[in-house]
A protein has these predicted regions:
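N-terminal amphipathic/basic-hydrophobic helices that include classical n-h-c signal peptides
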Residues: 1-9
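Cys/His-rich Zn2+-binding cysteine-cluster or related metal-binding knuckle/ribbon modules and their
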Residues: 11-17, 25, 35-100, 206
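Long C-terminal interaction/binding lobes of large macromolecular proteins
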Residues: 18, 110, 137-212
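Solvent-exposed alpha-helical segments within well-ordered globular domains of core cellular machineries
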Residues: 17, 21, 35-39, 50, ...
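Conserved, well-folded catalytic cores of nucleic-acid-processing
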Residues: 22, 26, 44, 59, ...
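Extended interfacial segments that mediate partner engagement and assembly in macromolecular machines
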Residues: 34, 83-152
């Protein structure tokens, strides 16, 4: 019998519940998975848990968003923004820092990045200003950006975000492109294989002109 399956209907340790509640805040983690993770964590040696606490505390103190691009970094200097060999007139926009590392692994792109705080979602109270689109527009204007590549997830929220960016810049000299159709509908950027992502970026098309 799966004891974890009984958790919602039986009383459990408050400490376990508190830990599970935190795990449930992670993406794609439901109640059962959260309780499994909580019990698994508490099954580790105490020394491992203490070490994890120290690592987490260090991350809380050190990790911050780059003021220029929004990437989560440890140091004061951003390895992307401060690299003067990169194309400084092209900005690739993603909705999560982990997407930057996925794209960097393809070696298909050598420009700058801008990390939004998620995709547009009125239902989840994610507005243009709250996800950072105002800051993106400011960057485009002040730095003379010539191309914005919208690499958002291929779901409704991601596509809506890409179209919104294109609409904001439709009367400017900056073009807005997106990866070619190699990425299937519903695709999540971090799960795309490097070759597919590389080809999609190299073959990028203007937003709104995908089927022409």
């Amino acid at each position: 019998m799966d004891l974890v399956a009984l958790i919602p209907t039986m009383e459990t340790s408050k400490s376990v519940k508190d830990i599970a509640d935190f795990f449930k805040k992670l993406p794609s983690v439901g109640s059962k998975s959260a309780y499994r993770m909580a019990y698994a964590a508490l099954s580790l040696p105490k020394s491992d848990l203490i070490a994890f606490e120290e690592v987490l505390n260090q991350a809380i103190q050190k990790v911050h968003r780059c003021l220029k691009c929004g990437l989560l970094i440890d140091d004061e200097e951003c390895p992307i923004c401060d690299d003067m060999t990169r194309d400084r007139k092209t900005v690739l926009v993603v909705t999560d820092s982990k997407d930057v590392y996925s794209i960097e692994s393809t070696d298909a792109y050598h420009g700058l990045y801008f990390v939004l705080r998620g995709s547009l979602s009125p239902a989840n109270h994610r507005t243009p200003s709250s996800i950072g689109l105002d800051a993106l527009m400011k960057k485009v204007k002040e730095e003379g950006i010539q191309e914005v590549i919208a690499v958002t997830n291929k779901d409704l929220e991601g596509e809506t975000t890409a179209l919104y960016i294109a609409n904001l810049l439709k009367n400017s000299s900056c073009k807005v492109t997106k990866p070619a159709q190699g990425l299937p509908s519903g695709a999540i950027i971090e799960y795309a294989d490097p070759l597919t992502m590389s080809e999609a970026i190299k073959g990028r098309v203007l937003v709104g002109k995908e089927n022409e």
